[in-house]
């Protein structure tokens, strides 16, 4: 593998940082914020003969040095103007944090202004779905539930709280979708932080990219990406919440930040998730005559417990750093396993454990009068995963234990303990080469190693040497460059980008090979290029049209190359997946109404799929190609003053094409399995002020979700549901091969106390107690009740 471009890029970043370090900073800097600490973008700052606008994060800097005694004036639409006097004679650098207060008679105007940040993200040339986490933070909802209401998005879960989650974006799922936290690949947190466990209170918003992914995320995603943006509030804050629900569910969230003198700060984010997940499911059990009969049973070995804490400290607004932040995260996950991938038979003693420690450092600095921005992140994580399957005997669905002679409930007993070491480096540079032109560069280097032991696991043939005891390494690097330009008075925005992907992996292929030398490592590597373009044309101040295309790649993952030393065999011949993505969309929005229509086309070649080879083993192979297209529509309308109606619908046609294996040629043209092709959402929410007393509020809401039946196996096209888009007819397949139509309704309310520090919420999930399925027809919980209390302090006195 060639590292020349990687080394050159890092060397260039380092030299540029040192070259510009001594640049003069004799100017005024600051940040314009609201009362609750949220930034105010595009505020006007006037001082001396200069006029500047605040950025999206509320920050600003004077364009040249300021001398003497000067008056500074700040104004923004919907806010009371602010004026102050500064004495710069004895100051080289001044940092101001200025709070603007909303005008009392412009509540509606302030409300619209508060959405500007989210709106600006929605209007980028590369389309993304933006979820405002603050708008739903007080509700007893998980992040997965909120994301499930977005157009083109389906969240598949293998059960209840904390269980496996898979995001499907326009039909593409699994490893084709990648996850980030504040622009950093989420892999650095080793499974301790994700959409299946993070409290929505700790997020500012969520960005979901469909197909085309911007350079600043730096991933090798094919189907899209999810970026979790955490609270970036630098004020002194504290917030906590506690949620209790059915199935002995308890969710605790806590976060706070304190500021100190000389721009030092420190904070903590923590949460605890626990649930018995002992809801009832419909299964088949064996009667006294050894015949299968339907039964409804309560899950008895499905509990989940998760602890996560991240503490951080740093300094900001210094001549040598805009922000330097050190953090350390600790987590532990304990999970019981109730059944294998399918609900075929129960387990009663298998346990999974995952724990880790993750220190990291992040450095941000602007140079050369804000013409160059540097964002550097480095982390090292040490995690351990443990699987215990040692019981001698079996359990039935009622929890009754029958002793046996063989070890383990599953086909592969285990006492595995595997250590993972991971290093991630992310370097991002932005060059403002002209008022309407920017160049962005992003480089990610991800290296991890795996080594462990399993007294009950596989051995090298003819030896007693544990396969897990031999170290496996994996490294990938991704370099992206983009040129963003504005034309015709910003009516036309264009983003042209190029990416380079490379990986190298080293390990031992010991699968069913009597001649394997346990000291002979095999190395594999590959590299490829991707490129694309995104363009947006602003028709008027209410509407725009945008389009994007991308040719991209996804590199094989370590577990796909090396297997899991269990039932998944290694395959060192895997090649990167390659995909062509295209999007076209139109958006129209006013203060009270918004509508967006989007279409997409995807074609993926050499898709990496898990394929059976010889029982009980399977192996990842470059087998199939997938072609998909579809559309979605997203609507919202504010009715009168207190109500808002939202709705969206998605139809997609994702099919298998170019099947190369003659044995599987019959699946040519069939739908991608386990993937819904139509789903829709409708929501209604209200906001009533001064209901029981002055300054209180009650916010009721209702959400309805519909999913059309979809197939668990490949179905011939003539057996699929007929009618318009397959929405009105019935399929001609066995009911065990499909997931039926599903309807989900959730109803709840949120009450905000007059002080605005306390709020209380309640929600009934699955109000109609419908049968719901997900992830290969794994049954989801029925009707459940949830209550949540929130406490928030906007400012803590030092």
Language model features with spans:
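Short acidic/polar hinge/loop motifs at secondary-structure boundaries
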Residues: 60-63, 184-210
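Extracytoplasmic beta-strand/coil segments of soluble accessory domains associated
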Residues: 139, 144-185
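Outer-membrane beta-barrel signature, preferentially recognizing the C-terminal barrel domain
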Residues: 356, 418, 472-474, 520-530, ...
């Amino acid at each position: 593998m060639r590292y020349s471009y990687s080394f050159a890029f890092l060397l260039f970043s380092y030299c540029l940082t040192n070259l510009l370090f001594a640049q003069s900073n004799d100017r005024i800097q600051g940040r314009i914020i609201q009362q609750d600490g949220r930034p105010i973008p595009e505020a006007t700052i006037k001082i001396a003969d200069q006029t500047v606008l605040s950025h999206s994060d509320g920050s600003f800097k004077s364009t040249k040095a300021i001398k003497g005694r000067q008056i500074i004036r700040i104004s923004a639409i919907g806010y009371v103007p602010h004026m102050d006097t500064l004495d710069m004679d004895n100051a080289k650098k001044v940092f101001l944090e200025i709070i603007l207060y909303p005008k009392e008679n412009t509540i509606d105007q302030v409300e619209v202004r508060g959405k500007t940040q989210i709106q600006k993200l929605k209007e980028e040339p590369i389309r993304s779905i933006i979820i405002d986490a603050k708008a739903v933070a007080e509700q007893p909802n998980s992040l997965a539930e909120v994301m499930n209401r977005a157009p083109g998005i389906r969240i598949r879960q293998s059960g209840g709280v904390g269980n496996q989650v898979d995001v499907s974006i326009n039909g593409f799922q699994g490893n084709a979708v990648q996850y980030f936290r504040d622009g950093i690949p989420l892999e650095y947190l080793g499974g301790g932080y994700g959409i299946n466990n993070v409290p929505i209170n700790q997020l500012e918003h969520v960005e979901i990219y469909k197909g085309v992914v911007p350079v600043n995320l730096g991933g090798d995603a094919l189907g899209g990406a999810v970026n979790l943006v955490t609270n970036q509030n630098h004020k002194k804050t504290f917030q906590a919440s506690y949620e209790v629900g059915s199935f002995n569910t308890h969710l605790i969230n806590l976060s706070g930040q304190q500021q100190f003198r000389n721009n030092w700060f420190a904070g903590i984010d923590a949460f605890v998730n626990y649930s018995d997940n002992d809801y009832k499911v419909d299964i088949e059990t064996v009667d006294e005559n050894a015949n299968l009969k339907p039964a409804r049973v309560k899950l008895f070995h499905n509990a989940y417990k998760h602890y996560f804490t991240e503490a951080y400290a740093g300094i900001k607004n210094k001549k040598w750093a805009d922000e330097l932040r050190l953090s350390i995260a600790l987590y532990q996950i304990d999970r019981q396993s109730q059944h294998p991938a399918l609900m075929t038979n129960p387990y009663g003693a298998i346990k999974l454990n995952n724990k880790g420690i993750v220190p990291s450092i992040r450095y941000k600095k602007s140079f050369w009068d804000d013409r160059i921005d540097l964002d550097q992140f480095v982390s090292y994580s040490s995690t351990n995963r443990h699987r215990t399957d040692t019981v001698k005997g079996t359990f039935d669905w009622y929890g009754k234990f029958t002793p046996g002679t063989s070890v383990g409930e599953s086909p592969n007993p285990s006492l595995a303990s595997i250590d993972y070491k991971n290093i991630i480096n992310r370097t991002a540079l932005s060059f403002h080469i002209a008022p309407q032109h920017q160049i962005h560069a992003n480089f990610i280097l991800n290296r991890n190693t795996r080594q462990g032991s399993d007294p009950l696991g596989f051995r090298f043939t003819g030896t007693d040497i544990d396969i897990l005891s031999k170290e496996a390494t994996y490294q990938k690097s991704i370099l992206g460059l983009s040129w963003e330009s504005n034309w015709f008075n910003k009516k036309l925005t264009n983003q042209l980008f190029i990416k380079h992907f490379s990986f190298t992996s080293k390990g031992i292929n010991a699968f069913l090979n009597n001649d394997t030398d346990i000291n002979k490592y095999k190395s594999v590597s590959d590299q490829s290029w991707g490129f694309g373009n995104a363009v947006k044309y602003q028709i008027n101040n209410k509407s725009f049209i945008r389009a994007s295309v991308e040719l991209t790649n996804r590199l094989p993952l370590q577990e796909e190359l090396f297997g899991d030393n269990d039932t998944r065999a290694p395959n060192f011949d895997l090649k990167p997946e390659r995909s062509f993505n295209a999007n076209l969309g139109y958006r129209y929005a006013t203060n009270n109404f918004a509508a967006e229509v989007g279409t997409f086309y995807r074609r993926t070649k050499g898709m990496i799929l898990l394929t059976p080879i010889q029982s009980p083993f399977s192996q990842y192979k470059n087998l199939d190609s997938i072609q998909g297209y579809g559309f979605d529509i997203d609507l919202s309308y504010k009715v009168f003053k207190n109500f808002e109606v939202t709705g969206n619908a998605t139809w997609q046609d994702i099919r298998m094409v170019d099947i190369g294996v003659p044995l599987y040629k019959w699946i040519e043209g069939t739908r991608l399995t386990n993937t819904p092709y139509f789903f829709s959402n409708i929501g209604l929410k209200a906001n009533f002020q001064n209901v029981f007393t002055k300054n209180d509020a009650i916010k009721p809401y209702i959400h309805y979700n519909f999913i059309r039946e979809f197939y668990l196996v490949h179905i011939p096209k003539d057996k699929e549901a007929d009618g318009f888009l397959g929405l009105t007819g019935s399929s001609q397949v066995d009911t065990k091969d499909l997931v039926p139509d599903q309807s989900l309704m959730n109803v709840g309310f949120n009450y905000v106390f007059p002080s605005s520090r306390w709020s209380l919420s309640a929600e009934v999930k699955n109000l109609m107690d419908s049968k719901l399925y997900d992830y290969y027809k794994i049954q989801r919980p029925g009707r459940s009740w949830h209550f949540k209390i929130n406490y928030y302090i906007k400012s803590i006195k030092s």
